[in-house]
Amino acid sequence: MRKIYLNFLFITLSLSLFSSSIDNNIIERELKVHKTPTCGCCKKWIEYMTNEGYTVSAEDHENLDKIKKFYGITPAYRSCHTAVSSNGYVFEGHIPSRYIEKFLKEKIPNAIGLSVPGMPLGSPGMEFGDRKMTYDVLILFKDGSSEVFATVSK
C-alpha cells in the first residue's frame, strides 16, 4: 500500500512540475482588434493573424482616438487599428506575428506593447504585389517612449 501511495505521489508531483513548465511557455493567442468599419487592410491583418493561429475578434468604431489614448498610444506611434491581447498588451498596426510572439515571450519590463506606425507597404495586410518597404517594429513603454524592437527589411 505504501508503494502505491509513493508512486501516486511521484506521478502527481511530476505532472505538476511538467504542467507548470508548459504554462510558462504558452503564448497568449487571443486578440481584440479595434478598427474602423471600412478599413480593408485591417480586415486583411485580422485574416493574416487568424491564419497564424490567433483567435481574433474585431470591434468597429467610427473614431479610434479615445481607444488609442486609453491604451497609451501617442499619435507618433499610431496606425489604422489597435489590437489588445487578453493580458492587456497593445499591438498597434501591421505587426508581423513573429514579433508579437517574441515580445510576449520576452516579457519586457515597463512595455505596453508594440507598434508599426503608419501602414508600411509589404507589412501583413498591406501587401501590394512584390512591393515592400523596410520598416521598424517599435516597443512602446509606459512613459511614452519607444525603441526599435526589430527592423523588417525588403
Label each residue range with its predicted role.
Residues 1-6:
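Positively charged n-region of N-terminal signal peptides that target proteins for export
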Residues 7-16:
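Bacterial N-terminal signal peptides
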Residues 15-25:
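Bacterial Sec-dependent signal peptides at the C-terminal "C-region" and cleavage site
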Residues 24-52:
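Local sequence-structure signature of Cys/Sec-based thiol-disulfide redox active-site neighborhoods
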Residues 34-36, 59, 94, 117:
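Active-site-proximal beta-strand/loop segments in catalytic clefts of secreted hydrolases
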Residues 46-87, 93:
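N-terminal, post-signal-peptide region of Sec/Tat-exported proteins
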Residues 76-154:
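Thiol/selenol-based redox catalytic cores and closely related redox-interacting motifs
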